Regions:
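Glycine-rich, aromatic-lined ligand/substrate-binding cores of catalytic
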Residues: 3-133, 141-144, 150-200, 204-213
Length: 213
């Protein structure tokens, strides 16, 4: 069993005319969001890991270790460590390593491609389906369901945190709950400190569309 902590904050955009709060639509995303995940230490990491998602124009401050001459772009990934950081554009393109005490990005050389064949991971996926569950082709997948399932769970928990921040304190109240740290028990698939947030984790399917899992 592993637990996660998630919290999110989103803006309320006022009308320019009279500065009355804009309506909130459950069917659409907020104009921007800031989501923080906290992962407890585990067998593969001996300390807490914090991951932050930003969108809608929100950006982190320019790290001091990266000089003002280096462009870090508008979208991307920033991994901060004790002795340096790794920056890349979106989808991990053009990754660069910066180490404290060294000027500029560190040259790490070209990394060789793995199984560089046409339609690489797509072909591996088809081969695994043909070979069947538990086959060598299945075990060798670089992104099988054992990995992709928890990854999707993490992303969707961020959406649950965003939607939870837009819950009102009571049916008659105009005050929103706002940012609240949610405690998640993945084994039970349950948010343990805000029961109303659990409505965003599952849904009631129409007759004939049940998943039966």
């Amino acid at each position: 069993m592993y637990k996660r902590q998630i919290e999110a904050s989103v803006p309320r955009v006022p009308y320019v005319a009279d500065f009355t709060p804009a309506p909130v639509y459950e069917e659409s995303c907020p104009p921007s969001s800031y989501v923080t995940y906290r992962f407890r230490p585990s067998k593969i990491n001996d300390s807490e890991v914090k991951m932050i998602w930003m969108d809608g124009g929100i950006r982190p401050s320019h790290p001091e270790i990266i000089t003002d001459k280096d462009q870090i772009g508008d979208n991307g990934i920033l991994m901060l460590g004790e002795n340096g950081l790794i920056w890349s554009d979106y989808y991990g393109v053009n990754a660069r390593l910066y180490i404290k005490g060294q000027k500029g990005a560190v040259e790490v050389g070209k990394i060789s491609e793995i199984n560089s064949v046409e339609f690489g991971h797509q072909k591996h996926w088809v081969d695994a389906i043909k070979a069947g569950f538990g086959s060598e082709e299945h075990k060798n997948l670089t992104s099988n369901f054992d990995f992709a399932g928890p990854l999707s769970e993490i992303v969707l928990l961020g959406n649950a945190a965003i939607r939870s921040s837009l819950l009102k304190r009571s049916p008659r109240s105009n005050i929103y709950i706002g940012r609240k740290q949610l405690l998640y028990d993945s084994k039970k698939m349950e948010i343990t400190n805000l029961d109303r947030a659990n409505q965003f984790l599952t849904r009631k399917y129409r007759n004939g569309w049940d998943l039966n899992v």
